[in-house]
Each structure stands twice: as C-alpha cells, then as structure tokens.
C-alpha cells in the first residue's frame, strides 16, 4: 500500500486533499494534530475514508497541544467508527487502553504502535526490542528513524524483512529514501509518499515519482 499524509490545517481542505490523494495512493494518513480545530464529527468523517488516524503528541514530534485525555477520546471515537487504522505511540501510557477498548466493542480498526527518532537510527538490537514491544501491544509495529548512512538504511531494510507483513518501517532523510522505495518488497505493510509540496517527513518521496520508480522495478 502507498499511504499519502494529509497535512492541511482546515477540515474541508483535509477532506478535499484526501479525495485527491486517493487517486494516487491506497490510503491516506490524517494528521489530526495539524488541524486548527477538530471535533468528534470530523473524526467520524475521516473514519469513512480509507485512512490512518494519527494525532501525534508534541513529545513525539507532533503538533497536538491540547490535553492527552482529549487525544485519547478522539482516537477511541475513530475506533468506534471503524477507522481502518489508528496510530498510537509506543511511549503513550494509554496505548493498551485503546487496544482493550477496540476489543471490547469488537471494532475492525487495526492499531499501529509507533516509535520515532528524528536524529538517528538506533542499533539493531534496540530496534528489535522496540518492534517486539510494539507487537505485544498492537497489530502493527511502526518505526521511523533518521538514516544517517547506507548502513542505517540496510539495518532498516533488514528489520522489514525480519518482521515481514507485521511492520511499517521508514528511514527518514536523504539516506533513507531507499527504504521508502524498496519497503514494500522487503516486507513493510505500506510506504509513505507525498503529494507535490506536501511532505510530512524528511526524505518523503513525491507519490507520482514513487509510482514511476515502482513500475520500473516491477
């Protein structure tokens, strides 16, 4: 799957961007933390669209400045409305609460548990520990780390292969671009690509360029 982030600040713009993005990608990621205001009704609308609902905490590199309680309630609302995926951080103390809630109401939502390091790619043993912890909590493990070298890129690709079909792994930055291009072949459930001029992370590839490259590889 190709996932395209939606990073608009206005709700109506976000919906329009999502519709346009789905002409090129398979799903979108709604970065709810970037919206000026968000309501439960907005989450209901987002949940109708094939998407990942992400409300990234400020302490994990996001823009959510309101209370964590509101954040968790909005994510629960997405789960209640059977959003395709919700993303919750490994460091979030209430991640298990979301999983329990999902199971109790028998929602079809898959829960992605994520970890980010915007400066480096940790050693492989540390990354394995992260992924194992994530898989004990949610359905899909995700990590996005900054790749500073080819060695970092190989490390990330190796882990994708180890956890084939259970992981989303990304190498941010120029050195990590190969992880975005080869990720699907190495076992990542999805790869992120952006609409022109709307990258949500360093090194994100334009979706049209990515599709051209993937067609050449095939």
UniProtKB/Swiss-Prot annotation:
Keywords carried by this UniProt record: Amino-acid biosynthesis, Aromatic amino acid biosynthesis, Lyase, Schiff base
Keyword Lyase among record annotations: yes
Active-site annotation: 116, 142
One Pfam family hit: DHquinase_I
Binding-site list for 3-dehydroquinate: 29-31, 56, 180, 200, 204
Pathway stated in the Swiss-Prot or TrEMBL entry: Metabolic intermediate biosynthesis; chorismate biosynthesis; chorismate from D-erythrose 4-phosphate and phosphoenolpyruvate: step 3/7
Gene Ontology molecular function: any one: 3-dehydroquinate dehydratase activity
Disulfide bonds: none
InterPro entries listed in its UniProt record: 3-dehydroquinate_DH_AS, Aldolase_TIM, DHquinase_I, Type-I_3-dehydroquinase
GO biological process: 3,4-dihydroxybenzoate biosynthetic process; amino acid biosynthetic process; aromatic amino acid family biosynthetic process; chorismate biosynthetic process
Catalytic activity: 3-dehydroquinate = 3-dehydroshikimate + H2O
EC top class named in words: lyase
EC number(s) stated in the UniProt entry for this protein: 4.2.1.10
Description of how the protein assembles with itself and partners: Homodimer.
Function comment: Involved in the third step of the chorismate pathway, which leads to the biosynthesis of aromatic amino acids. Catalyzes the cis-dehydration of 3-dehydroquinate (DHQ) and introduces the first double bond of the aromatic ring to yield 3-dehydroshikimate.
Record-stated family: Belongs to the type-I 3-dehydroquinase family.
NCBIfam families assigned to the protein according to its UniProt record, in alphabetical order: aroD
Record-given protein name: 3-dehydroquinate dehydratase
């Amino acid at each position: 799957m190709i996932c395209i982030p939606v990073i608009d600040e206005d709700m109506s713009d976000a919906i329009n961007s999502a519709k346009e993005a789905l002409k090129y990608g398979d799903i979108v990621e709604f970065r709810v933390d970037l919206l000026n205001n968000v309501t439960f009704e907005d989450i209901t609308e987002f949940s109708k669209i094939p998407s990942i609902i992400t409300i990234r905490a400020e302490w994990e590199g996001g823009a959510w400045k309101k209370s964590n309680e509101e954040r968790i309630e909005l994510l629960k609302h997405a789960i209640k409305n059977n959003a395709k995926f919700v993303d919750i951080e490994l460091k979030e103390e209430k991640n298990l609460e979301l999983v329990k809630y999902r199971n109790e109401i028998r929602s079809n939502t898959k829960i992605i548990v994520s970890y980010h390091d915007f400066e480096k790619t940790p050693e492989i043993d540390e990354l394995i520990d992260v992924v194992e912890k994530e898989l004990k909590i949610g359905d899909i493990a995700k990590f996005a780390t900054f790749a500073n070298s080819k060695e970092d890129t190989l490390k990330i690709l190796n882990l994708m292969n180890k956890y084939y079909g259970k992981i989303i792994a990304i190498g941010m930055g120029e050195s990590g671009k190969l992880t975005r291009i080869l990720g699907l072949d190495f076992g990542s459930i999805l790869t992120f690509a952006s609409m022109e001029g709307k990258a949500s992370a360093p090194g994100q590839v334009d979706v049209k360029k990515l599709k051209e490259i993937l067609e050449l590889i095939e």
